[in-house]
Each structure stands twice: as C-alpha cells, then as structure tokens.
Amino acid sequence: MNAQLLQPAFVDPVLDAQRGFRAALKALAEPGLIQHLPSAPHLDGLAPATYALCLALLDIDTPLWLAPSFDTPLIRANLAFHCGCPFTANREDAVFALLGEHDLLDLGGFDHGNDRYPDQSCTLLVQLTDLEAGRGLLWRGPGIKAQRQVHVLVPQAFWLERQRREAFPRGLDVLFAAGHHLIGLPRSSRVTEERA
C-alpha cells in the first residue's frame, strides 16, 4: 500500500462511525426520507456520504465489490486501510457493493439471500449526483405511512431490474448517497409510478 495515497477519514472515528451507522439505519427504517451526514469526510471519487457509509459499515468481515468507476488505487488504499475490508472481484461473494447510477442496469450475481437467511444478502451502496432531481415515484411499505413521493435520479431500467428480481423476503437493500445526504431503499419497499 502506498502511504501517499492515504487521506484522513473520520475526525472522531468512534462517534462519527456511530453517526454514520445510525444514519444508515434510519434511512432504511424510514425509506425515502433524506438523511444528512454533516461531518462526513471527503475522498476523491467518493461523495462524503458514500465515504461515511463505507467507513461506518465496512470491516474485515464484509467483502466489498467495486464497480469499475470506483476501482481506483486511491479508493482501494483508503478503504483497505481505514475499514480493513477485503475486496472481491466476484459479485456473489460481496456483502456490500459500491456502484454508480450506470451500474444499476444489471443486478445479476449479487447475493439476494435465501428464504431462511434473507439478511445475508448484499447491500448496494449507490453514489448518485442528486437525490431529488429524478421523476417522482411513490414508495410504499414498512416505515412509510401510506406512501411517500421520492425523486431519486436513477435510470428507469433500474426499477425494472429491481422488480424483475423481486422475491421477498430475499432481495437487495440499497443506500443511495449524494453529497452529504443519503436515502435508503429496503427490499420491503414497493415503488410505483406517480399517478397524475
């Protein structure tokens, strides 16, 4: 590992990791509500919220799959040093996957869990440019009273791919991040078109 590649992570590793973990939990418990991570650090190539999620969630027991756009020496060196996470080239071995919006068109190969242990599925950490610039979609499910309108900017093909692979309780949980913000989409949430 090249020490020149290493950049600072959390200022207060324990408290900041706890804040990041709680934000991720709250995002998945209240799908579609934007969570804010004001003290998230910066790493070139990763939005502050994306980097904070990695620092809070990844460790030696969580193999990470990197989409090609995130598979850089800088990102690898910092995640290996600060998180201790192993990297995998095989989607099926990943506990977490780091993707961009263009990587959402094919979710094949990621572990969707099984009926007995659905919690053993892969969690997708998806970096976007904006969490509020997409067309309005209605989210329903646990943690949402009636329905919630969400404007996450992802390709339409992602929603079709997600729906095609739906087999609750199996599925993929998703944390979308942009800037200092994140939104959770658990496998239990249903997404439909907004009706005029």
Stretches found by the model and what they are:
Residues 1-63, 67-70, 81-83, 179-181, ...:
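N-terminal, charge-rich interaction modules
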Residues 73-196:
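Internal, well-folded beta-alpha domain core
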